[in-house]
Amino acid sequence: MPKTAKPKKPVDVAELTKAQAKVEWKRLALELEVHDRLYYQDDAPKISDAEYDELRRRFNAIETRFPELVSSESPSQKVGASPSGRFKKVRHAVPMLSLDNAFAEEDVRDFVGRIARFLKLADDRIDFSAEPKIDGLSMSLRYEGGELVTAATRGDGAEGEDVTANIRTLKDVPQKLHGRNWPDVCEVRGEVYMTKQAFLALNERQKEAGDTIFANPRNSAAGSLRQKDPAITASRPLGFFAYAWGEISGTPPAETQTGMIKWFEQCGFTTNPLTRLCHSVEELIAFHRSIEEQRAELDYDIDGVVYKVDRIDWQERLGFVSRTPRWAIAHKFPAERAMTVLKDIEIQVGRTGSLTPVGKLEPVGVGGVIVQNVTLHNEDYIKGIGNKGEVLREGRDIRIGDTVVIQRAGDVIPQVVDVVIDKRPAQARPFHLPKTCPCPLHTDVVREETATGEEGSRARCTGEFACPYQKIEHLKLFASRRAFDIDGLGEKQIAFFFEQGWVKEPADIFTLQKRNAGLKLEEIEGYGETSVRNLFNAIDARREIALERFIYALGMRHVGETTALALARGYGSWDAFHEACLKVAAGDEEAIAEMDALDQIGDTVIKSVAAYFAEDHNRGIVERLTQEVKILDAEKPKRHSPIATKTVVFTGTLEKMTRDEAKATAERLGAKVSGSVSKKTDYVVAGPGAGSKLKEAQKHGVQVLTEDEWLQLIAE
């Protein structure tokens, strides 16, 4: 038997070449974009918190080493995901940002050290507010004249969803602030959550009624709050902890974070009773250990603790870095684990033909959730080899019949992190990926190639649109919230129409009403005249669609939402994009070069676009679809700052702010701050003592500003 090649360790970020970094940056950016959408908008995460955090850490490390890769579309510059469209949008007066994470005690020490250096203080002179990190749905409540006027989810940090009617049903949210002398405008922020006991009771009722079972309290809280009918929300026992604020007119009611928490209580809000004031790093770490010990006994889910600089004036001085405040951090807990038996491995076929092994488990409770299924990713993962060739589980393979260790960190689909070899039965069966697709056609299965042309770890059915499993997944994507977003046409309805032969391709959706005289949908159980009329109205409402949504809805491999947006902005209109795609498919070198020059577009996407439009079948699908819909031109990105997208270098001594404060301000306004001067530099801000960088600026003809000129520029 030939020897298996030894898996390679992942390349350290410090050893990546610029070309390698660019490829991995694009891949990670797309992954993070998808997972942010699944978590924040769909309430349906597909990876664990630990997996997500690892993706984010590596992505941030690449951007730190190669800052030229950072763009306005980078996940590092965003928070959460855009509002879904099911509710009216609300723009936050003050953005709702996310937090950086600490995973080890050393990370906490570094966090405190950075703050002390920024403020030029000793570590022991800084007090911190410490509180449990509630695993729920972030919310902003706006009060005007003491009356609740708007409640909005976090969304993408800039815009959220208006859930005011639903929030009014929560007993923890006062309709009118208690007391008197409140600010004219006050935004109270916090977390909507569901207790573990309420979650279990709700799932029991859902099960008895034959309705959807929620995976965990966080998903149940999010799903309960984001209901169209407030009566449903009112029937769900939701709580709210207040812990922060957004816009406040005039002077804040307190000078410290802990003072604001007390003020929230006076106004009628519930705050977390475990919140503490800590005076040192040691006290922060002791608080983390104490809360972790209490975690299992708490009646609500938490996934860590949060530390915040207590003095509000220091918070304001520290400011923000990209999508996170510099003055706060989340100290996460390790993921929860359990052991169970892997009973079987089944194959699922995805939209692009990818074959994914799914492990069927002996049901086991992990963190309050009963887990029965687990993704096993691909054949290499099962063999103990990672995506980049690294060794997993010390090389131990996973076999049917094995006792496995399951890890869950607040997610829906957990992961196998280890195999208990001592418990492996003699009859345990190694897994071998089938050579043909499990679809009725049994078409051949091939391994996908990597970006370097090597055989990859993922297998794919070669049936393309002939494979019914792929066809139906394409249609589900087309009608999904992030594509055409057709209300009333969910996955179950798509599957039913497909099985009946009524919808075989996207254009069929828009001809349903014409064909309904023969189909008679209203006579089908579960429909009726009103629901059919509503469905047809919803379909008609989507006959106009944004270019980026249309491109995404085509379901081309490697063309997710971010890539679709980049293509839409690059070409501007459907006609221009369509013409370019046909030329790329025909091998036109000029068209290929033009597409390659677009931001975030590389060889993998170009090959995918070419392959898609080279197929007669696909071109026919597109042609028939464009006869039914109107595709709107792409909107140009808005630039609100005079220094947005500009590259700035600071040199010399700044007298009105620290260097860190100047850098933070520039980045907050959309500029890129560099440590060296080149021809691509737009501004050099020079203070007393400016040396070689000032000379370089003069050499390259870069505009040089004094500190006062800089402050005047950014004030415009």
UniProtKB/Swiss-Prot annotation:
Under the GO molecular function aspect, what terms does this record hold? DNA ligase (NAD+) activity; metal ion binding
Q: Where is the active site?
A: K133
Which terms are listed as keywords in the entry? DNA damage, DNA repair, DNA replication, Ligase, Magnesium, Manganese, Metal-binding, NAD, Zinc
Report the enzyme's class at the first EC level: ligase
- Which residues take part in binding Zn(2+)? C437, C439, C461, C467
Q: Which GO terms describe its biological process?
A: DNA repair; DNA replication
Per its record, the protein catalyses:
NAD(+) + (deoxyribonucleotide)n-3'-hydroxyl + 5'-phospho-(deoxyribonucleotide)m = (deoxyribonucleotide)n+m + AMP + beta-nicotinamide D-nucleotide
Where in this chain does the entry annotate a coiled-coil region? none
Query: Where is each BRCT domain found?
Result: 638-716
- Cofactor(s) annotated in UniProt: Mg(2+); Mn(2+)
Sites where the protein binds NAD(+): D49, A50, E51, Y52, D53, S98, L99, E131, R154, E191, K308, K332
**So what EC number does this one have?**
6.5.1.2
Query: Which Gene Ontology terms of cellular component type are present?
Result: cytosol
PANTHER family, A to Z: CHROMOSOME TRANSMISSION FIDELITY FACTOR 18 (PTHR23389), DNA LIGASE (PTHR23389:SF9)
- Functional note: DNA ligase that catalyzes the formation of phosphodiester linkages between 5'-phosphoryl and 3'-hydroxyl groups in double-stranded DNA using NAD as a coenzyme and as the energy source for the reaction. It is essential for DNA replication and repair of damaged DNA.
- State the family named in the UniProt similarity comment for this chain: Belongs to the NAD-dependent DNA ligase family. LigA subfamily.
Its recorded name reads DNA ligase
Whose protein is this, by species?
Answer: Bradyrhizobium sp. (strain BTAi1 / ATCC BAA-1182)
Q: Which gene is the coding source of this polypeptide chain?
A: ligA
